[in-house]
Amino acid sequence: KGNFTWATVDINVLNQYIQELRVHKGYRDTTTARKVASIKSFFGFLSENSIIAEDPTDSLGSPRVGRTLPKFLSEEDVTTLLNTAYKSGSNEGQRDAVIMELLYATGLRVGELVSLNLQDVDQSEAYIKCMGKGSKERIVYLHSKALDELRRYLRESRIALLGHRRTEQALFVNHRGERLTRQWVWTILKTYAQRAGIDPNITPHTLRHSFATHLLQNGASLRHVQELLGHSSISTTQVYTHLTNGYVKQEYAKSHPRA
């Protein structure tokens, strides 16, 4: 209507739409949740392509439906996936391997990963500062293998991929020297999963689930994993406990299977 553009859509408009679906159209929570997921994906695309300045769905809630158990990879499948990427030998392959290594080493959400800048990485202390949900900053740690590969990427492939765009601050860049998008990382995961002969339907969140599950299986405390994942409530983290049976350990390096 009138001067409508996607930029005019704000959280109030979206909440009214969700209310319309649930109250007036009688949609079930599962149906509404799927529509909310589609809306978030669409506005995420608009934001990443600079069609809108801010994503109005960042604070958009979704109906709570029955929680499904998280899908995760075995430690062996993670190793196979990473080795497949490391063997490619190209600049993109080195970058892709480091992306997957970091997703598994840190439990970062894909949106957090692609938002990282060079200054967010503290190589001397082996940690990364990231901005999570609700604009909450947290620290995630790098084991020695992940740190070594990240350093190599920064010395080699990132410089080659940047070309003439030497002032770009994004940690991960494409072949044009521009910041990678979430969709690009999804494609990377599926490509290497197919090459590795493992489930091609994995997503970046599968590595986050694998990170949490493997830490707990190897004895990390639930509170420790909650902090690393950036969960505001421990009840969110408890979904992983159905798979764990280890002794509690405090040090991340002793808990992570690739440490």
Task: Report the location of each language-model feature.
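Conserved catalytic core of the tyrosine transesterase superfamily
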Residues: 1-259
